[in-house]
């Protein structure tokens, strides 16, 4: 998912 939390996904 795009967004500030996208960097939390592998």
UniProtKB/Swiss-Prot annotation:
Q: What is this protein called?
A: Cryptide TyPep-5
- Give me any GO biological process, just one: killing of cells of another organism
- The record lists the organism as Tityus serrulatus (Brazilian scorpion)
Where expressed (tissue)? Expressed by the venom gland.
Q: Which UniProt keywords apply?
A: Cytolysis, Secreted
Keyword Transferase part of the UniProt annotation: no
Signal peptide position in this chain?
Answer: none
Q: Note on file?
A: The primary structure of the mature peptide is identical to that of cryptide To27 from Tityus obscurus (AC P84676).
GO CC terms in record: extracellular region
Function description: Causes weak hemolysis. Does not cause mast cell degranulation, LDH release and does not have antimicrobial activity. In vivo, causes intense edema formation and intense pain, when injected in mice hind paws. It also induces discomfort and anxiety in mice, as it highly increases rearing behavior (but has no effect on locomotion).
Q: Where does it live in the cell? A: Secreted
Residue stretches in coiled coil: none
């Amino acid at each position: 998912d795009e967004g500030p939390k996208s960097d939390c996904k592998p």
